[in-house]
Amino acid sequence: MSEIHSEQDLAHTLRRFAQFRVSGVIVTSGQPPEALVNECVHQHIPVVGINRQPTIPGVDYVCSDNAAGAELAADQLLRSGCRRFGWLNTHPSTWAGRMRGEAFSRALQTRGVNIERDLAHLACPEEGYVGGEQAAALAGEVPEGIFCANAQLACGFLDGMRQRGKQAPEDYQLIGFDNTPPTAQYSYQLTTLHQDVAAISRQALTRLQERAADPLQPSRTTWVEVTLIHRRTSPFVI
């Protein structure tokens, strides 16, 4: 297992791969160094990317179905009576985050929402929890229904809005993505899209084995179903 934060980390990781003669690599970071993936392909090491943009030939990808998740979020907020919407994400974003935002915009538009007028892109100066908290402080008029790119942003936004005296779902509704353990805690009770980590892991290992058996096969992308978990910040609507 390796974490790469610098060019030195990248060089060290590549040396370790050569030293231990690894038989396969799974890249899980939201923004993994492309040089690492390309070098593995060059050395004929099978690579599977998880939740990353499918762009490199000879690499297989396993991704949560971000577009379907965004549609579930749009449907939930519309059924709940929301008419003004917000999208919260960092800039620059991971590929998965960008895909979720673009799909959310499309889903609203195809359901009759004027996205030029009724969809706000909320400013998020930093990543993670702190970024969500800052976005809440910077937000002017708060949209009725907000979709967040990930759970950390959503939790930070919830706490930031509490500091402004606003609560979900009384003052606005909020849906996150990831369903990490903190989202189920009593203080958050975040309605969120659930990524099936076990299914993603199984598919990644299967693709790795298949790539090792047939290195020249075309690249494939597997989309893993996501589900909407209803909690307090956007309750279930019949």
Report residues per predicted region:
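Flexible loop/turn connectors
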Residues: 116, 134-238
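Alpha-helical recognition/docking segments in bacterial nutrient-uptake
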Residues: 1-75, 135-141
